UniProtKB/Swiss-Prot annotation:
Family per record: Belongs to the class-II aminoacyl-tRNA synthetase family. Type-1 seryl-tRNA synthetase subfamily.
The protein, known as: Serine--tRNA ligase
Lineage: Bacteria, Pseudomonadati, Pseudomonadota, Alphaproteobacteria, Sphingomonadales
Functional description taken from the UniProt entry: Catalyzes the attachment of serine to tRNA(Ser). Is also able to aminoacylate tRNA(Sec) with serine, to form the misacylated tRNA L-seryl-tRNA(Sec), which will be further converted into selenocysteinyl-tRNA(Sec).
Keyword tags: Aminoacyl-tRNA synthetase, ATP-binding, Cytoplasm, Ligase, Nucleotide-binding, Protein biosynthesis
Quaternary structure (record): Homodimer. The tRNA molecule binds across the dimer.
Molecular function GO terms recorded: ATP binding; serine-tRNA ligase activity
Domain of life: Bacteria
Binding-site list for L-serine: 230-232, 284, 384
A Pfam family of this chain: Seryl_tRNA_N
EC number of the protein: 6.1.1.11
Compartment(s) where it occurs, according to its Swiss-Prot or TrEMBL record: Cytoplasm
SUPFAM superfamilies tied to this protein: Class II aaRS and biotin synthetases, tRNA-binding arm
Amino acid sequence: MHDIRLIRENAEAFDAALARRGVGPVAQSILSLDSRRREIATRMQEVQARRNEASKAIGAAMGKGDKDTAEALKAEVAALKVELPALEEEERQLTAQQNAALAAYPNTPAADVPEGADEADNVEVSRWGTPRDFAFAPKEHADLGPALGLDFETGALISGARFTFLKGQMARLHRALAQFMLDRQTGENGYMECIPPLLVKDEAVFGTGQLPKFAEDLFRTTDGRWLIPTAEVSLTNAVQGQILGEAQLPLRMTALTPCFRSEAGAAGRDTRGFIRQHQFEKVELVSITRPEDSESEHERMTQCAEGILQALGLPYRKVLLCTGDMGFTARKTYDLEVWLPGQGAYREISSCSNCGDFQARRMNARYRPEGAKGTEFVHTLNGSGLAVGRTLVAVLENYQQEDGSVAVPEVLLPYMGGLARLTPQG
């Protein structure tokens, strides 16, 4: 949600910032609503003050025996009592319209975000690792996985397209990856482990920006709750409506949860394999910070995600998203794209975003600086640390052997109960 005060102070700058994201100009329409709402609010105050004044004057007139004046004042008070509810209703409607307008447009991009229309305009920042030189033609995970326990047919039989059934050694590897990620993020990177709800209310999904614009991408239950598309929703909303102390910041949280997405906008994309699923697991990272700390926290969070890929020995590249490819709530986003030799391409495995105070305004999440009387909105950040299923895909493709087996990365061996290789016989 945007700050109406900033729009009042510099409408041109607001329109220019949104224009970088292909939106606008919208400032004048928002300010028109704001002006009318403020006029009505002022009139309400005037009516309330005059009603109180006239009510007192009635008693004074009656005390003097001036019945004519008293009756005139009574008539005026009666008229004001009729006018006031109408003004209150108009003010309520205008406030709702203004808030809807402030919530309808995406976050304004940071100054160093490159302009562009789509992913083709993203800017590569760095690369890590050298893709393995295979002595054979590497397979895609969709071809390699079924013999190792990645069962697409059973998943489709039970639940339909974009569901997968993991069995035996494959399920063990998936669990090992998730546990390793959690251990690294909590033990070395200082994130507090959480187990949040998977079902959330409208207010929570609005707070993190999925509602109202992206409802079709979500699953809704019959009682009106939503299955989380990411633990970002639950973790970020943990500070909804709160005023935190400065000493509580930064607040760093992590959670391993199932995530549920309808993939309404992904028809025809990644229909084979384990890349794009309706249900998948992810280790999410969320940070709540002071405004002046969010940029450095963004770099730190991204490094925490990169550390998982480095520990697993998976080549990847870091990409700065352009204005046309960023998510709705982000002011700056880094994507980490892992090398998949079977596809011969880098594919997204983590997205780390600084949302500034955009989500905090929607959630009314604040903090009180030490020694200050007033409060300020916090800044919120989120990132994948990592998507477990896509990391599984990357391990399968990068560690595959010519005989169809897959070597287990060294850092995962303590989690595998002595299993050092996935084999078709296993």
